Amino acid sequence: MLALGFASYLSIYPALLFIPLVLLSYDRKTQESKHAPSTPAFTVQHFAILLASVAGLLGLSCLVIEDFWEFVSATYGFQLLVPDLTPNVGLWWYFFIEMFDSFREFFLGVFWLHMASYVGGLTVRLRRQPLFIVSALLGVFAIFKPYPSISDASLYLALLPLYRHLFPCKSSLPSCPCRY
C-alpha cells in the first residue's frame, strides 16, 4: 500500500486500484494464515496506510515547495479539470472540443464517473480474480485517461501474457468455427 501511496501522490488513477489491490493482499493473507483477518479491519488498516503515505508526501511537498497550492493544482487539478484541449491520442480532447462550454462540468463528471464505475463493476463480477481486475483496469485507464501516454498502454500490454492460457478461448470470427 505504500507503493500505491507513492503512485497516488503523482496521479489520481492509481488510487482507483485500491479496492482490487486490497482484495489481492487479503486473499494472499488468508492463504498464508490459518485464520482469516477481519475484512473491514484489514481494509481500514490498508486505507490508513495509503492515506498516511499520501498525506506524508503532500506534507513534505508543502515544506519543500513555496507555492503548495500551485503544485496541487498542477498535479491533481490538471487531470481532473482537463484544461488543455490540444489533440492527443486520448478521447477526451475530441469530445470536449465538440461540446459547448456550458456543458463542460457536467461531462467532466460523467467521464470521471464512467472511468470509476469500472472499478466497482469489475470487482463485484470478478471477485476471485483480483489480479485480472488490476490488469483490466490498467487497460481501461490506458483507453479513457484524458492525457494518455505510451507507457499506459505498454503497462497494460506487458500484463497480457499473464493470461496467455486464455488466448485460445477468445471469440473472434476467424479463430472459432461456427457451430449452429
For each predicted feature, which ranges?
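Short, aromatic-rich membrane-interface segments at the entry and exit
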Residues: 130-133, 149-154, 170-175
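Primarily membrane-embedded glycan-assembly and transfer machineries that use lipid-linked glycans
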Residues: 22-140, 149
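Short, flexible/disordered secondary-structure transition segments
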Residues: 17, 30-33, 170
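Membrane-interface alpha helices of multi-pass inner-membrane proteins
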Residues: 1-21, 137-144
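Hydrophobic transmembrane alpha-helices of multi-pass, membrane-embedded glycosylation machinery
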Residues: 6, 16-27, 157-162
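C-terminal multi-pass transmembrane helix bundles with aromatic-rich, positive-inside signatures
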Residues: 144, 161-180
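Hydrophobic/aromatic-rich transmembrane helices and adjacent perimembrane loops
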Residues: 149-165
